[in-house]
């Protein structure tokens, strides 16, 4: 009977440890989810800013006339 009580106690300890681990991991998932949402917002802002940039008035290298010595 003592062996059974010891096994039950061991299982209760393992369960308590697993519950604690799950709580810690749950908090990490929440933090990472918040971080991901923030980074997605920053990326959307950056994309918006890049799309609103005026194209350069300088000609591309393909549009440039070659120098006279060619």
UniProtKB/Swiss-Prot annotation:
It comes from the Bacteria. Belongs to the SlyX family. This is Protein SlyX homolog. It comes from Shewanella woodyi (strain ATCC 51908 / MS32). The lineage of its organism: Bacteria, Pseudomonadati, Pseudomonadota, Gammaproteobacteria, Alteromonadales. The gene is slyX.
């Amino acid at each position: 009977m003592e062996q059974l009580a010891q096994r039950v106690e061991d299982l209760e300890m393992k369960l308590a440890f697993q519950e604690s681990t799950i709580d810690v991991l749950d908090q990490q998932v929440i933090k990472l989810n918040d971080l991901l949402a923030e980074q997605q917002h920053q990326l959307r802002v950056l994309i918006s800013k890049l799309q609103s940039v005026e194209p350069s008035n300088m000609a591309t290298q393909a549009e440039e006339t070659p120098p006279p010595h060619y």
